[in-house]
């Protein structure tokens, strides 16, 4: 994170998370190592964001992001 950039306080799966101002959902998921993974879904403030919109979906102070990863098991 750029030391001169403002930071946002958001929540990711109900846990506080600090993020650089101007961040997008894609940037957050990249930081979490999930941007290129299959089987990932994300919602911001209760609204599902289609994968095609991750790059353009800006995040704001106090946004609540829910990240879901599909898993297989047997």
Language-model regions, residue ranges each:
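Ubiquitin-like/PB1-type beta-grasp interaction modules and other compact soluble beta-rich domains
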Residues: 1-73
């Amino acid at each position: 994170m750029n030391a001169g950039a403002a930071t946002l306080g958001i929540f990711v799966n109900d846990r506080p998370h600090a993020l650089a101002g101007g961040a997008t959902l894609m940037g957050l998921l990249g930081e979490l190592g999930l941007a290129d993974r299959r089987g990932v879904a994300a919602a911001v403030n209760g609204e599902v964001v289609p994968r095609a919109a991750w790059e353009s979906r800006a995040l704001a102070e106090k946004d609540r992001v829910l990240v879901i990863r599909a898993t297989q098991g047997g």
